[in-house]
Regions:
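Class I S-adenosylmethionine-dependent transferase superfamily signal
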Residues: 83, 160, 278, 351, ...
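A short acidic, Gly/Pro-enriched loop at the edge of an enzyme's catalytic core
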Residues: 130-142, 320-331
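Conserved proline-anchored active-site loop of SAM-dependent methyltransferases
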Residues: 139-150, 267-274, 328-340, 351
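A short glycine-rich, Lys/Arg-flanked "PGG" loop and its adjoining helix->strand segment in the class I
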Residues: 154-166, 346-357
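Conserved beta-strand signature within the Rossmann-like core of class I S-adenosyl-L-methionine
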Residues: 167-175, 358-365
Length: 411
């Protein structure tokens, strides 16, 4: 298990029909996908567990008649969906921290298939939340990729285990049949960890015998200086640049000025370093922070409270059509470097929709060539210039009537 941010690999397509890269695009062909190895192995074990558990005559004496289950997923939530359909007396919560993945799974569960109804099971809830609800569970199922982010994995495991009733069971799996790391993590909860071997994965079962004595706080509080002000920042696992200020965010902050009454939008705000820094510069300006990650939005909101800022608003959004389009003076973003610039293009176009005529896009990148070539397709007066180990790219939304928003470059 390494420490890179967890981006699940694509599931394997099983012909049945929508490429869900955009969960809101109804024109694309949809496919029902088979679960990844770790999720399929976990599903097999969970089925056996539930068949045995629900078949016991005294099960209702040990649990409520409605078995409460929570699940995470490395794909489209196939294990949670299958359990909900096959065991209708259960109540299943499928939990994501990212709205894009939540919407993608919601759509996937409603695809017609040879063995699946086209409607979402009534006992399955698919939600995007920063944290698992503080509700008691009888079973938690947690498939994990061996290349996932360690702290996020530990956070998931701890939350799921903490929510279990005493006597409840955690079933976790990893796509590494020789795994030791996950096994060691589970032994921190209980000494007895049962193992189920699979060809492509390893599955573990842990029965909760006592409450956890202490919960580890995986959040991190740090501070950075911007324009002689100390900005307090809160980061969490699963949010970009956990436990540190991203250097790209620093370059973005250094590249722009804020003027009174300005309306700025921070697209893909992460933990909010750019939003918080700019909001502290001028209380008369307003900053709208948007992200698809519920934890990112949580971090920004908590950061605003910690810095006593009243001029920040937030929006959880995965489709790029943000509130109050065409009204912002400046859009700022730090696009990711993966995806052959497909994600970068979506963010640039989201900025274009958000800006007023004459508004300015400012972004930071380590790969300036694509922006030099493509920004002029949508913006005028485009600039790309070096900033430390990065480049700042900028352009103005076309208009002949409204003067452009000024850009202050670093010296």
């Amino acid at each position: 298990m390494n420490t890179s941010n967890h981006t699940p690999e694509p599931d394997r397509a099983v012909p049945a029909h929508i490429d869900l890269d955009d969960p809101n695009d109804s024109t694309r062909t949809i496919y029902r996908l088979a679960p990844r190895d770790e999720e399929q192995a976990l599903l097999d074990v969970a089925r056996d567990y539930l068949e045995s558990f629900l078949g016991k005559e005294d099960c209702n004496q040990r649990r409520s008649p409605h078995l409460r289950i929570a699940a995470v997923s490395t794909g489209r939530g196939q294990a949670a969906e299958a359990i909900a359909r096959e065991f209708p007396s259960t109540s299943v919560l499928l939990w994501y921290i990212d709205l894009f993945h939540q919407q993608r799974s919601l759509q996937h569960c409603q695809i017609d298939g040879s063995e699946n109804a086209s409607q979402l099971p009534s006992n399955l809830s698919i939600r995007c939340l920063a944290d698992l609800p503080e509700e008691k569970l009888d079973l938690a199922i947690v498939p994990l990729p061996h290349r996932g982010e360690q702290e996020l994995t530990r956070d998931y495991l701890q939350q799921c285990y903490d929510r279990l009733e005493v006597g409840g069971t955690l079933i976790a799996s990893v796509d590494n049949p020789k795994d030791k790391w996950l096994h060691d993590q589970l032994k921190l909860f209980e000494k007895s960890v049962r193992v189920r071997e699979h060809k492509e994965a390893r599955v573990y079962l842990v029965e909760k015998t006592k409450p956890l004595k202490k919960l580890k706080d995986f959040r991190c509080e740090l501070a950075f200086r911007d324009c002689d002000e100390l900005v307090q920042l809160i980061t969490r696992p699963g949010v970009f640049s956990h436990r540190q200020l991203d250097n790209g965010a620093r370059q973005l902050l250094d590249a722009v000025d804020v003027y009174p009454e300005a309306r700025l939008i921070d697209i893909g705000c992460g933990s909010g370093s750019v939003s918080l820094g700019l909001a502290m510069r001028d209380s008369a300006a307003t900053i709208h922070a948007v992200d698809s990650n519920a934890r990112a939005i949580w971090c920004v909101e908590q950061g605003a409270v910690k810095n006593n800022l009243k001029n920040i608003t937030t929006e959880l959004n995965a489709n790029g059509d943000y509130t109050q389009p065409g009204t912002f003076d400046m859009a700022l973003t730090n696009p990711p470097y993966f995806g052959d610039f497909q994600i970068a293009e979506k963010l640039v176009l989201a900025a274009l929709r958000s800006l007023r005529s004459g508004g300015r896009l400012v972004l930071v990148t380590k790969q300036p060539s694509w922006y030099q070539e493509n920004l002029p397709r949508w913006f005028q007066d485009c600039e790309v210039f070096p900033s430390g180990r990065y480049h700042i790219a900028s352009g103005i939304k076309p208009s002949s009537q409204i003067p452009p928003t000024p850009l202050s470059t670093i010296g």
